[in-house]
């Protein structure tokens, strides 16, 4: 009984005497003395071992801000949670902490968890693989990808494509995905994500397929838009004339409904041309950034960023400081910082 009371008192201290659990939006941590840090470490370690799921999750959040020179035992306990905790939610939280702290020493644990049958654990492990840049995971990720049904939209497929796209191109993966891209019976959103995959890793193996999709008016607008976006990212200079011709067709439309429907394709086409060095068309992209509609301006910030053109920095700096929309300001600031 006295041990239970002691632990209850410890938790009480955790909430009251020591600033162990911080507010998520707190910008600065309270400066603690060496003695306080050691006490806080002791309490956090106890919570990670014996606390409720909620308390342990909060303790992991605290670990993300804990001084690394004092966190050895806490990191070790994190590894134990990662490898063998019976509570799958705690393993998910542990994976997130490993990602946040970029603890590459747990690479093998993450690779094993990629094969975990619990969907949330597997999904979080995929995100961790991307954040930690674990290229070694490529064969495992590809095996998981091959087993998926591409006729159905799936967050798992999207996550796999996003992660694999960050690694250098591999012939087997590119060939497999190019085949799925060309199968028009597959889910259009998944095909669009495959198009983005090729732009992300700049694999020109897909260049001609992306161009054909872009030109095909029967293909979904999102797929065509993402295809031309990827052509821009891979600097497909040979595609510029076709993109300019398609853009001219859009400009010559008379139907208001058609003009509205093709706006995403238009702005992606403009962005692609700017990415490939067409300075003359950059002013059209600026026009979107000056639109009265904050939603249009917000999209324009992303497209300005996607161009990779340093000349857009001036308008981004203006938007970050003076745009009427806080969302646009925030997006512009993030674009500058990244």
Q: Model-found features: residue ranges?
A:
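Conserved hydrophobic register position within alpha-solenoid helical repeats
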Residues: 59, 94, 125, 157-160, ...
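Classical Sec-dependent N-terminal signal peptides that target proteins to the secretory pathway
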Residues: 1-23
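A generic tandem-repeat structural signature
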Residues: 87-169
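Structural signature of alpha-helical solenoid repeat scaffolds
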Residues: 64, 99, 130, 162-165, ...
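Short inter-helical turns and helix N-cap capping residues of alpha-solenoid HEAT/ARM repeat scaffolds
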Residues: 51-52, 86-87, 117-118, 149-153, ...
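N-terminal leader/linker segments that initiate helical-solenoid repeat arrays
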Residues: 18-77, 89
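Residue-level detector of extended alpha-helical repeat arrays and alpha-solenoid scaffolds
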Residues: 56, 91, 122, 153-157, ...
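Amphipathic alpha-helical scaffolding segments comprising HEAT/armadillo-like alpha-solenoid repeats
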Residues: 34-47, 68-82, 103-115, 134-148, ...
């Amino acid at each position: 009984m006295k041990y239970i009371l002691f632990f209850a008192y410890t938790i009480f201290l955790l909430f009251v005497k020591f600033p162990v659990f911080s507010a998520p939006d707190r910008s600065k941590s309270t400066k603690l003395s060496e003695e306080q840090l050691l006490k806080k470490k002791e309490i956090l370690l106890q919570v990670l071992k014996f606390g409720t799921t909620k308390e342990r999750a909060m303790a992991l959040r605290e670990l993300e801000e804990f001084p690394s020179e004092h966190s050895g035992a806490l990191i070790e306990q994190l590894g134990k949670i990662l490898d063998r905790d019976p509570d799958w939610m705690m393993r998910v939280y542990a994976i997130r902490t490993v990602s946040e702290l970029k603890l590459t020493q747990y690479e093998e644990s993450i690779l094993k968890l990629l094969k975990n049958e619990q969907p949330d654990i597997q999904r979080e492990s995929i995100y961790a693989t991307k954040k930690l840049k674990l290229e070694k995971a490529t064969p495992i990720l590809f095996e998981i990808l091959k087993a998926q049904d591409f006729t159905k939209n799936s967050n798992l497929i999207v996550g796999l494509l996003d992660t694999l796209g960050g690694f250098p191109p591999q012939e087997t993966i590119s060939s497999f995905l190019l085949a799925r891209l060309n199968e028009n019976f597959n889910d259009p959103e998944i095909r669009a994500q495959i198009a983005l995959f090729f732009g992300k890793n700049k694999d020109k193996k897909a260049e001609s397929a992306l161009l054909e999709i872009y030109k095909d008016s029967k293909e979904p607008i999102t797929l065509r838009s993402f295809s031309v976006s990827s052509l821009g990212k891979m600097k497909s200079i040979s595609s510029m004339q076709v993109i300019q011709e398609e853009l001219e067709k859009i400009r010559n439309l008379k139907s208001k409904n058609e003009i509205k429907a093709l706006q995403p394709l238009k702005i992606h086409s403009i962005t692609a041309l700017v990415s490939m060095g067409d300075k003359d068309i950059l002013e059209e992209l600026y026009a979107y950034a000056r639109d009265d509609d904050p939603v249009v301006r917000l999209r324009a910030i992303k497209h300005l960023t996607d161009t990779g053109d340093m000349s857009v920095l001036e308008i981004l700096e203006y938007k970050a400081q003076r745009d009427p929309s806080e969302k646009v300001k925030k997006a512009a600031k993030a674009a500058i910082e990244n």
